[in-house]
Amino acid sequence: VVHATSTGAMYSDVAERYAADDYMQKGTVVMIGGTEEITEATGEMTDRVFGVTSTQPAFMMNSSAGNNDSHPYIAMVGRVPVRVIGTANKGDRIVLSDTKGVARALAANETANCNQVVGVVLQNKTDAAENTIECVVQCRV
């Protein structure tokens, strides 16, 4: 069953609410676990990546569960800002960094399986600091 008021959307991701064990910034990489359903992802290049907290989902599933602080929307698929540290080039794959909840570009000499990849970068990032950048993501289970 689809409940909709139009066939288009202003934003670009499909997201679902999940119970979080703590408040999470928008663009945070998450994994299943913690004291609730999801927690900030840990472990550089982990294959337990589940998704990314959404900023403005186009389609919101499980919308009556909690609020943005207790049950953030997790982008299941689509275009979403992701917290990334270090430089990244458009088209780079991103994986979890050694910083909790933050991704990084996969280095040229590294390989990753599909469960380690958070998404693909849509814009160049030229500084080393942590910032959010647009990426295409897909939920992993």
Question: For each predicted feature, which ranges?
Answer:
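Extracellular receptor-binding modules and their adjoining Ser/Thr/Gly/Asp/Asn-rich linkers
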Residues: 1-141
